[in-house]
């Protein structure tokens, strides 16, 4: 079966010629899209993936960072997930804050929406939170500042950014996905393989014997998965 991919810019569908979409844990994803369009394109980009008449799953939410004209009828788009705003400098000096208060400030500056579980570490207050680097560095530092075990942060399919312990995430509260051996088209080392596209599969998912997906690359009708043992 061939997957059904629906691509939109600012809510309007557009024809895809080819696509390469790369999602990772703790790093904003990116997409290279070639589209049918005689003129340059800008704005919010979404990609939904599904099979036949099944419900579509949102695979990518981002924006056009750069548009290059390939020929008179095609444009090449370099897109980033909305969380890519965290690549920019994000200095902060906050006093007497908990995890949610830090993320409220990040949201105020970046416009991002965060999802934080109702867990003890989310209620711990620290004397100060200090960061002079970029947003990614600030997000990574949350694990140590708030003593969060098995910490992850990543953009979800709905555009929100989950922040917390992996076990409290969408995938952490679900059993491992059992992917049959025949689904894998080829292994690329001990921690990577190519499979037919699976709608809804994203970094953070756990498969088979506890392997945790760290990266998903969607190209054409195939996905390349990378994983690690936690």
Question: Where are each of the predicted segments found?
Answer:
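Assembly/oligomerization scaffold segments
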Residues: 1-84, 190, 195, 213-226, ...
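Short beta-strand/loop turn elements enriched in aromatics
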Residues: 1-25, 107-110, 159-186
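Short beta-strand-centered interaction patches in the first periplasmic/extracellular domains
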Residues: 74-82, 118-187
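Short acidic/His/Gly/Ser-rich catalytic and metal-binding motifs that mark active-site loops
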Residues: 86, 115-117
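A conserved acidic, glycine/proline-rich C-terminal tail/linker
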Residues: 178-211
């Amino acid at each position: 079966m061939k997957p059904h991919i629906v691509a939109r810019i600012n809510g309007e569908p557009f024809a895809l010629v080819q696509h390469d979409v790369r999602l990772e844990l703790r790093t904003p994803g990116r997409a290279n899209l070639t589209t049918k369009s005689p003129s340059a394109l800008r704005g919010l980009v979404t990609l939904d993936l599904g099979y036949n008449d099944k419900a579509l799953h949102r695979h990518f939410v981002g924006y056009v960072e750069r548009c290059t004209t390939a020929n008179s009828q095609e444009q090449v788009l370099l897109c980033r997930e909305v969380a890519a705003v965290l690549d920019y400098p994000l200095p902060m000096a906050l006093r007497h804050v908990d995890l949610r208060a830090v993320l409220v400030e990040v949201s105020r500056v970046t416009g991002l929406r965060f999802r934080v579980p109702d867990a003890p570490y989310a209620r711990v207050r620290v004397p100060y939170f200090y960061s002079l680097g970029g947003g990614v560095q600030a997000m990574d530092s949350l694990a140590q500042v708030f003593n969060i075990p098995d910490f992850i942060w990543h953009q979800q399919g709905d555009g929100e950014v989950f922040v917390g312990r992996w076990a409290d995430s969408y995938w952490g509260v679900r059993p491992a996905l059992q992917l049959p051996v025949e689904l894998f088209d080829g292994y690329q080392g001990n921690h990577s393989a190519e499979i037919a596209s699976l709608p809804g599969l994203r970094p953070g998912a756990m498969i088979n014997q506890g392997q945790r997906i760290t990266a998903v690359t969607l190209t054409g009708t195939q996905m390349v998965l990378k994983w690690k043992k936690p």
